[in-house]
């Protein structure tokens, strides 16, 4: 019963990290867009 659970956990963590990274990138993109708009 052991291994499958740990694999599930790893996948879950990976998914969460990817999700967080995506959100961070979008935040960064939004900030960059704002800066661009400010300079124009």
UniProtKB/Swiss-Prot annotation:
Gene3D superfamilies: 6.10.250.1920
PTM sites of type Isoleucine amide: 40
Residues modified to Pyrrolidone carboxylic acid: 1
Keyword list, A-Z: Amidation, Hormone, Pyrrolidone carboxylic acid, Secreted
Record-annotated disulphide pairs: none
Cell location: Secreted
One annotated GO molecular function: hormone activity
Stored InterPro entries: Corticotropin-releasing_fac_CS, CRF, Urocortin_CRF
Main subcellular location of this protein, as a coarse class: secreted
Pfam families, alphabetized: CRF (PF00473)
GO cellular component terms attached to this protein's record: extracellular region
Keyword Cytoplasm: no
Protein's job: Hypotensive and diuretic peptide.
Family: Belongs to the sauvagine/corticotropin-releasing factor/urotensin I family.
Name of protein: Sauvagin
Source lineage: Eukaryota, Metazoa, Chordata, Craniata, Vertebrata
């Amino acid at each position: 019963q052991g291994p499958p659970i740990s694999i599930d956990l790893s996948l879950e963590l990976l998914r969460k990290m990817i999700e967080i990274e995506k959100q961070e990138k979008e935040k960064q993109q939004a900030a960059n867009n704002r800066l661009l708009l400010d300079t124009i």
